[in-house]
A protein has these predicted regions:
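N-terminal amphipathic alpha-helix/helix-capping segment at the start of soluble metabolic enzymes
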Residues: 1-23, 116, 279
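Hydrophobic faces of well-ordered beta-strands that scaffold small-molecule active sites
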Residues: 18-24, 49-51, 73-77, 95-97, ...
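Glycine-rich, proline-tolerant flexible connector loops at the mouths of alpha/beta enzymes
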Residues: 25, 30-31, 42-65, 96-104, ...
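Hydrophobic or amphipathic alpha-helical targeting/insertion segments
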Residues: 82-123
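Catalytic alpha/beta core domains of metabolic enzymes, predominantly
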Residues: 127, 135-282
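Alpha-helix-loop-beta-strand connector modules within alpha/beta enzyme cores
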Residues: 56-77, 110-122, 182-193, 277-279
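Glycine-enriched alpha-helix->loop->beta-strand junction motifs that scaffold or abut catalytic
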Residues: 69-71, 88-95, 116-119, 186-192, ...
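Active-site mouth loops of central-metabolism enzymes
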Residues: 15-33, 52, 71-79, 135-148, ...
Length: 347
């Protein structure tokens, strides 16, 4: 089991629930836009947020951003150790650094000293795209073994400076390399692990890669925080992360929507209806399964494993509860009838 690490008002590791992270895509210097996006992501289920800090103005903006948000803010630092120090001085709850790209050991120590003074966790990040040349040569290419050695070397560097309030992340866009790296490092450290497939891609490819990679890693009991990296709206990352955790049985809550793939018997616009249902239930705080079926012939039977379902017909639809037809309603009222049942579920 990994050690516990406190990040602002959240605790990770030590068997605590796996938390969902995302990253803002606003300019961090724009306080209002960044805070607004963080609050939107928080409402969707984000637990920890990371912000890019490429400038001193961005580091200073964290102080005002922190006043407007409720979840921990992680400062993402590259190259300039002074930005890491400024970010911590302005309220960052955690910093993410790659000690290999912020300069000499003295500069790393300057960052570690401030982190130690304020008890701010450091996430040590290693990425397959920036693996050290000597490790590439040693392992004849970028490999899981090289990534793990790089990460553990950087962890030891900081531990030797007298600080061990650390989180480790190993990222690769190669899904199976990423899986192997996590399997290797999990047996060699008790620091919490942040898990994600980097540069996963657009919504479709990114979701598939992340679901496979994170699924294989998390199913082995590895991982304390996750991010689904997508080229798109960060809100999509939260939706996907929640579904991955729920599918693996690692998080409860939230309505699960299942729907049939459509066939020649489909008598309604099922694709539109399923999307409408998915959007409708996003903010309903129930831990149930909802089925959306395309015909009244197979609908009741196929929806049997769901808590509630709907099936469309010609001009009318069925509301199905626990596999039994509960009521018939006009097709035009099907969505609203389902909404009513969900909002009054516990009555």
């Amino acid at each position: 089991m990994t050690k516990t690490v406190q990040i602002g008002n959240r605790i990770i590791g030590g068997g605590n629930p796996i938390l969902i992270q995302s990253m803002t895509n606003t300019k961090t210097e724009n306080v209002e836009a960044t805070a607004a996006q963080i609050n939107q992501l928080t409402a969707a289920g984000c637990d920890i947020i990371r912000c890019a800090v490429p400038t001193m103005d961005a580091a200073k903006a964290l102080k005002e951003i922190k006043k407007q948000v409720q979840i921990p803010v992680v400062a993402d630092i590259h190259f300039d150790y002074r930005l890491a120090i400024a970010a911590m001085e302005n309220g960052a709850d955690k910093i993410r650094i790659n000690p290999g790209n912020i300069g000499s050991a003295e500069r790393v120590k300057a960052v570690v000293d401030i982190a130690k003074e304020r008890n701010i966790p450091i996430r040590v990040g290693v990425n397959s795209g920036s693996l050290e040349k000597d490790l590439v040569e040693k392992y004849h290419g970028v490999t899981a073994e090289g990534l793990v050695e790089s990460a553990l070397d950087k962890v030891k560097l900081i531990e030797d400076m007298g600080y061990d309030n650390l989180v480790i992340s190993i990222k690769s866009s190669d899904v199976m390399m990423c899986v192997k790296a996590h399997e290797l490092i999990a047996s060699q450290t008790d620091h919490p692990l942040h898990v994600g497939i980097t540069e996963a891609g657009t919504i479709i490819s990114g979701n598939i890669k992340s679901a496979i990679g994170l699924g294989l890693i998390l199913h082995q009991g590895i991982g304390d925080t996750i991010r689904v990296s997508l080229t798109g709206d960060p809100l999509e990352e939260i939706k996907s992360a929640k579904l991955i955790l729920k599918t693996l049985g690692l998080r409860q809550g939230g309505v699960e929507v299942v729907s049939c793939p459509t066939c020649g018997r489909t008598q309604i616009n099922l694709i539109q209806l399923a999307n409408q249902v998915e959007n409708m239930v996003a903010d309903i705080p129930l831990d149930i399964k909802v089925a959306v079926m395309g015909c009244v012939v197979n609908g009741p039977g196929e929806a049997k494993e769901a808590d509630i379902g709907i099936a469309g017909g010609i001009g009318e639809g069925l509301i199905i509860k626990h596999g039994e037809v509960f009521k018939k309603v006009p097709e035009s009222e099907l969505l609203e009838a389902l909404r009513y049942e969900l909002l009054h579920w516990n009555e």
